[in-house]
Amino acid sequence: MTYETDTTLMLVAVGEALVGILGNAFIALVNFMGWMKNRKIASIDLILSSVAMSRICLQCIILLDCIILVQYPDTYNRGKEMRTVDFFWTLTNHLSVWFATCLSIFYLFKIANFFHPLFLWIKWRIDKLILRTLLACVIISLCFSLPVTENLSDDFRRCVKTKERINSTLRCKVNKAGHASVKVNLNLVMLFPFSVSLVSFLLLILSLWRHTRQIQLSVTGYKDPSTTAHVKAMKAVISFLALFVVYCLAFLIATSSYFMPESELAVIWGELIALIYPSSHSFILILGSSKLKQASVRVLCRVKTMLKGKKY
């Protein structure tokens, strides 16, 4: 790639990462301040903070990988030195997805209304189960991340750089099957939390449909609090699903780069697209939470006042 292309893509990556880190840091900071003030933290705030922190780490790792690929290609080609980056990318990737899945599950049990004994048992205990569930997500992510990182051979990154592939064509061809196997396993693992979130979304739709059949809306179109809660939860879950699909496609591009003519460019484009998911979803979560939305309005008002004061 040319110097101009490298510079442009790097600026875009840095801009995306900074916007996402700012949004996720805001979520974590607001919830942390509320925790310090009240000496306790609500389950929803704990989940949102976990999602935000995992995505801050994920965005930093993606940005670091992108910078090393462009600015330090020799370091990028050394699989042993980059194995740490691979591990933390895989770990934060799984944590981010699993924590977001926990958010979908929490919305389902808090808002939906079903009368199955198991559903009611979990619904009554969901607040007590959240911390255990988040810890289980950490353990699951670690269990998947360690084997995957070990299975990534040292030749993988050499296949990304075109100049290295010229001298290592045979080696790359030999290892393509192994790389493809790791890639397929990575994407299959991500399919399970996606399916759980999808089922949660479908059950929320079913619950909303049953709820609207039991109530009568007024002439003005007023919706009761339960209906509003259903709609808000569905918006949050569907936005996660849509952005997660985009992220998986980007992840597929990045991990399949060794099959493509311009491997380095494919990796960078994959990482740029991947940054959209954690960056965009943070602002959707802020707008979907009354607490975070009010805090953001207060911050914007203060910034606006400060800017006006500087003008005069």
UniProtKB/Swiss-Prot annotation:
List the subcellular locations. Membrane
User: Would you tell me the Gene Ontology cellular component terms?
Assistant: membrane
Q: Which residues lie on this side of the membrane: Extracellular?
A: 1-9, 71-101, 150-187, 257-266
Q: Which Pfam families match?
A: TAS2R
What biological function has been recorded for the protein in this entry?
Answer: Gustducin-coupled receptor implicated in the perception of bitter compounds in the oral cavity and the gastrointestinal tract. Signals through PLCB2 and the calcium-regulated cation channel TRPM5.
The extra comment attached to this record reads: Several bitter taste receptors are expressed in a single taste receptor cell.
**Stated name of the protein:** Taste receptor type 2 member 7
The scientific name of the source species is Mus musculus (Mouse)
